[in-house]
């Protein structure tokens, strides 16, 4: 009898276990097959679960007949689970990005649609449509943003936003201001795109939170979290110009409380090319490596603690095709050779208190050893930054953000800028700028939100600096938002970082007066409307802006061809314009993003007769357009991308009235195509063509570099006043000048590569 009862009990347990059912699943991005962590799996009884860091989930008995899967930035999915023990959910990205979480506008994580400041979000999927080895090149297909090359020889550049020059744009990494001043000249080339989670762009004033360098715009590069990054990634690319780029990343655990994200980026281009036959390299030869490591620490109550570091080294040169390093610093063959050593440390620590308080910090050192012909430039910059932020909600209507910041800046070079003119001793420029800021988000009602902000900085020379800001958001509907932003800005120049031409040997720098700091007043209007019909979505993003500058510090190229004259503008400068972005998506197959910008950037100053004269600065276009068009065949795993930009004429710097080069650039365009094939959820291959039209500036001018055959001006003759004299050997009265550049000199090329990912 006992044996029978025991046998019956065992059989009953087995039957009971068999009748129980569990559902396991994974949520993946439909395009990249990358896991989607944090996705919500909602069941019919209103209970829900979240996917883990690898996109996986488990639902134990009882298993519902269907589930509803949602994730930020993706289109929702409703799926049946009948007679299934496992489920693979493919989510298609909602490219309208209306619900994307942003932090740059207010320093607080908030959905893009709810932010009072318009923040544009660009993910790695956007940058993959036209792959590039650096973030500098990746920005070329963003409307209103233009990477500008400033030298035909060394290919230094900066980033223009809405027609304003690079120094008006602040570039941060994870919100830390470590890419500035000296680093902004070459440092933008060393940020690996493989480790970027997203790029957030604020067009217009952001000085109230980020300080004086953000008066024209902000580019915040947000790196991936070690908690969500794949176990291993590899991105390898090569071009027909013999450019080679290897980008590796890996995430792993260190013990039970630390997660690490390690990335290594290597770029090599050593192929000398001279397609325009001026005996100078068309593209700077480069050899660089960047190593990045980010640690995330597990703490009680999920408090944040991260620590990251990056090391960057680059050896680049351009110049005479016969040049090699034995000629470095000499005056027989001209070459511009730059060695860059740079390290960065940054982190964030949420304080162990009941209030939401966090300390952010960064430190960086940038060393540049360079020769521009026979002109040496040895620069050394160190920046230490710390910021304590308190995020406090008061009642139902007010969200306060207050903080204190401290920035230490050290700068030294071998020029007279850091030399005591009385004693001849070296006198590095170093100073501390403390700052305080306060911001209040005031929710008037469900439709209206007002943001009020004020920042105070104390500059050692210019003393107290107030930068107020105000923003108003009006939610006309769930998919329709109107924003108004206004603020002021304050800026002091750094001569080398703002005019690299000062070191090319082409022009000498002259400062005729004590330079006062710039002041700016900005206003920005933004309107967003999103539409949805069945499998078609459309979104419209329109903005208008106006910026007014007093005491603007300008570089005058026109008064004397041998000088760059720095002075405060006796008058005013202004930038105004309109920008429009349109996104269209059809059934997860066809996607298009197109944008156009129309702008009027000018300065007004009095001439000798006392009359106001309005002029347009050099290298500033009146209009531009960008587009990204993609078509996907999901069953075949194929995606086709067509990207490009189009720029209107811009004024170019001429040496004299007899300079035969055109005074304005033609309408020009860079266009690219790419085909990518998803082999598996781990492997993807891609190939394409860059610069389809084979456009280079040499097509519209007799020469790009003036007197490239005499770069040291040994055969140039001058008159008593220092002006260049026309001779039979120099009929146009020119001197060596490589600053006549507005577009890349690199023509058409084929590229290809592979992307490999292990979850």
What are these model-derived regions, one by one?
Residues 269-290, 296-357, 363-383:
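Flexible loop and strand-edge segments within Gram-negative outer membrane beta-barrel domains
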Residues 443-446, 544-548, 568-655, 755-757:
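Gram-negative outer-membrane beta-barrel transporters
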């Amino acid at each position: 009898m006992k044996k029978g009862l025991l046998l019956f009990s065992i059989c009953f347990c087995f039957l009971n276990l068999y009748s129980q059912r569990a559902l396991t699943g994974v949520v993946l991005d439909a395009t990249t097959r990358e896991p989607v962590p944090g996705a919500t799996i909602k069941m019919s009884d209103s209970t829900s679960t979240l996917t883990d860091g690898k996109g996986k989930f488990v639902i134990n008995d009882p298993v519902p007949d269907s589930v509803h899967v949602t994730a930020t930035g993706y289109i929702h999915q409703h799926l049946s689970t009948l007679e299934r023990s496992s489920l693979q959910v493919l989510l298609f990205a909602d490219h309208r990005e209306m619900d994307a979480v942003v932090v740059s506008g207010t320093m607080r994580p908030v959905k893009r649609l709810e932010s009072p400041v318009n923040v544009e979000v660009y993910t790695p999927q956007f940058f993959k449509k036209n792959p590039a080895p650096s973030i500098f090149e990746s920005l070329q297909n963003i409307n209103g943003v233009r990477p500008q090359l400033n030298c035909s020889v060394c290919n230094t550049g900066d980033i223009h936003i809405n027609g304003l020059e690079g120094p008006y744009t602040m570039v941060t990494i994870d919100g830390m201001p470590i890419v500035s001043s000296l680093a902004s000249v070459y440092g933008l080339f060393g940020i690996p795109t493989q480790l970027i989670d997203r790029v957030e762009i604020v067009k217009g004033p952001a000085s109230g939170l980020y300080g004086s360098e953000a008066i024209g715009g902000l580019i915040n590069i947000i790196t991936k979290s070690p908690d969500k990054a794949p176990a291993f990634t590899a991105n390898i690319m090569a071009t027909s110009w013999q450019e080679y780029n290897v980008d590796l990343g890996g995430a792993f655990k260190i013990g039970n409380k630390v997660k690490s994200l390690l990335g290594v980026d290597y770029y090599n281009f050593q192929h000398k090319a001279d397609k325009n036959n001026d005996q100078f390299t068309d593209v700077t030869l480069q050899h660089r490596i960047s190593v990045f490591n980010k640690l995330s620490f597990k703490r009680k109550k999920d408090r944040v603690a991260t620590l990251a570091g990056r090391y960057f080294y680059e050896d680049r040169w351009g110049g005479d095709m016969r040049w090699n390093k034995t000629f470095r610093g000499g005056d027989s063959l001209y070459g511009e050779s730059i060695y860059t050593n740079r390290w960065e440390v940054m982190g964030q620590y949420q304080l162990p208190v009941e209030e939401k308080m966090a300390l952010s910090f960064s430190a960086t050192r940038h060393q540049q050893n360079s020769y521009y012909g026979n002109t040496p430039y040895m620069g050394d910059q160190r920046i230490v930054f710390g910021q304590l932020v308190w995020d406090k909600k008061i009642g139902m209507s007010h969200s306060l953000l207050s903080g204190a910041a401290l920035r230490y800046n050290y700068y030294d070079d071998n020029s007279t800028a850091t030399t005591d003119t009385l004693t001849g001793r070296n006198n590095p420029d170093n100073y501390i700028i403390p700052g305080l800021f306060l911001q209040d988000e005031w929710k008037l009602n469900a439709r209206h939100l007002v943001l009020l902000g004020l920042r105070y900085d104390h500059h050692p020379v210019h003393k107290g600096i107030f930068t107020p800001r105000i923003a108003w958001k009006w939610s006309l509907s769930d998919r329709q938002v109107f924003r108004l932003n206004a603020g002021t800005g304050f800026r002091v120049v750094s001569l080398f970082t703002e005019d690299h031409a000062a070191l090319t040997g082409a022009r000498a720098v002259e400062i005729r007066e004590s330079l006062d700091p710039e002041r700016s007043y900005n206003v920005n209007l933004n309107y967003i409307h999103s539409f949805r019909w069945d499998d078609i979505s459309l979104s419209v993003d329109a903005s208008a802006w106006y910026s007014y500058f007093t005491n603007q510090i300008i570089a005058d190229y026109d008064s004397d061809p041998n000088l760059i004259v720095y002075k405060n503008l006796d008058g005013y400068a202004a930038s105004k314009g309109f920008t429009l972005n349109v996104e269209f998506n059809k059934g997860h197959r066809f996607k298009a993003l197109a944008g156009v910008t129309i702008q009027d950037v000018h300065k007004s100053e009095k001439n000798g007769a006392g009359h106001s004269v309005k002029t347009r600065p050099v290298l500033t276009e009146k209009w531009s357009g960008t587009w990204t068009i993609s078509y996907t065949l999901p069953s075949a795993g194929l995606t086709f991308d067509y990207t490009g930009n189009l720029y209107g004429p811009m004024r170019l710097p001429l040496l004299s009235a007899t300079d035969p080069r055109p005074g304005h650039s033609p309408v020009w365009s860079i266009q690219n195509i790419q085909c990518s094939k998803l082999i598996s959820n781990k492997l993807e291959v891609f190939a394409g063509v860059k610069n389809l039209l084979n456009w280079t500036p040499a097509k519209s001018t007799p020469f790009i570099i003036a007197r490239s055959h005499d770069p040291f001006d040994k055969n140039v003759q001058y008159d008593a006043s220092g002006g260049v004299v026309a001779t039979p050997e120099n009929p146009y009265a020119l001197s060596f000048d490589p600053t006549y550049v507005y577009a890349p000199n690199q023509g058409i090329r084929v590229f290809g590569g592979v992307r490999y990912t292990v979850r």
